């Protein structure tokens, strides 16, 4: 099948053999006789190879740059160790196959306990501190006891929607319309802030009213027929307007400051949908990419600043490994065998403006430009930062959440000074803890951090009427695509509750880096186009150009905000798989659809133990549902049935397997019923990408087949 932006070839078994993008960059794939992915030859010539045992478990991965990742398994096929040049990660499980501990490459161990239904009941940090959790009869989280002993409680309505979050210092209430859209959200206690929302007939947010400190700010959003955001207007007078080409690339962004002054930015792209220039009058930034589609340079040519260059470097898995700024500011990154960022090292002054900020200049309502000192030059011969200390931050993660989360970060300077921040999570990130303070997070209705409330650990109780003078409240607001507003920008968890780096303007979304000022990712999505999702044909788009009503937590797939909200309270447990992080992205991209088509038959032959069954139930829940409540309910019911079986019964595995297969079939039936709702994508694809009618009909067959898990479906 040929796409508007390139072509791909598959063998008779449906295995992807070659993929060529519109720029002529070709990726090749090879498979073992069993059909397992054996090698990937990337566009830049890098070869990734994979070795398996006789059961198909991945043993050795050559991940490029001369680096390998080796995996070990226990007798029932669950990964116990993953080793790379950075060190070894060790996993331990209980009898039901649930992950009970992870020891990272630095020797830091995180431990977990569970109830009979697989809900995590506690997490113990390396220093011995613990966060504990309770659940109701529907397996919804009802309380979290944090690192300081403070309890956060959750209450739900009859429809399963969260209606209150309450701790000793903050209480947030939620109200919804008849279809589950959030209408109001109000927080009281240590701080007072409220939000209300309005929607169009498609469920997209059209308005937000924020009330804080007696001040009300209204934001309105408009969309085109394809659901792309076309304007963002605040009652402060700040405004952004957007125009797009047929591929969804933003071609113009007009920013109007609160002072009424307009700035028009024009963008151009190559046929691979890569941003090549951003222009403001006579000034411009030129962007270049490597053959794998990752941005490697930005060059600003400006009347005010001359020529300034940023440079980026990546490993063979397209993970950012180095940033060298126009002013000599530098960052370096390392990753573990799971592809998770292990450390960030930086040197130089991080209080700086990005090239995009310098290009557009000061705009009333956005952070002020940090002017360059005369000694600062471009990265081509930049003044190297001499006499400055490097600072290295190491990260520790919780792997049991749907999207792995940082639970601790320790920053150490080359001079030896060190500080640690730990994080506690419930239905979202609750608070950050240092040696002498606690910072609680308050969110807007979209899930972005609206306030960070910091108070001394040993401080007096906070009055809901008049906060103690030692309490510091920091407020955040954002443009539609996620740039921080106000006079200054701050690094930390912010837009969509993800980690923002103010020095580089990047949001770390795990698999890729998102740049709000560009409204897009700086790295190509390695997943092939998904025929169910129109805009996946453009590998750089963020949330289908609808960032107010969609979120992207992993840099791979956007989900509607309503779907994310509807999943609140569900606690499906994910067990660590045999492939992690960056390489998991590569492998899943190739075998994902095939696995979906054959999952039931695979399970029938591969489910040899209850631990494998439980693991597959968890994986199935994560892979099929995209947080669909009905399918999660089916999977949870299967887990309960399996947990209720007598493990000493000789027929135990057979019975557990039968329960799982029945859940597969029931979930598939449910998803098949929803296939008709995807019909609108056919029209979108035809209108936007010019597919012929026969191609559209083939896509429809694939769509229905995928959702029905039809093992016999072929492209012809």
Language model features: what each stretch is:
Residues 219, 361-368, 375-377, 460-463, ...:
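Low-complexity, glycine/serine/proline-rich disordered segments
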Residues 341-344, 350, 451-455, 483-487, ...:
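Short, low-complexity export/processing leader segments characterized by acidic and small residues
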Residues 1-5, 18-24, 39-45, 60-66, ...:
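Beta-turn initiation residues at beta-strand->coil junctions
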Residues 478, 524, 528-529:
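Peri-catalytic substrate-binding/gating loops that frame the active-site cleft of hydrolases
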Residues 532-534:
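Short linker/helix segments within small regulatory modules
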Residues 331, 497, 527-530:
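Conserved short loop/turn motifs at secondary-structure junctions
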Residues 5-7, 120, 264-271, 434-511, ...:
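A motif-centric feature for acidic-aromatic and gly/ser/thr-rich catalytic loops and repeats
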Residues 1-18, 26-36, 47-57, 68-78, ...:
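Aromatic-rich beta-strand edge motifs centered on tyrosine
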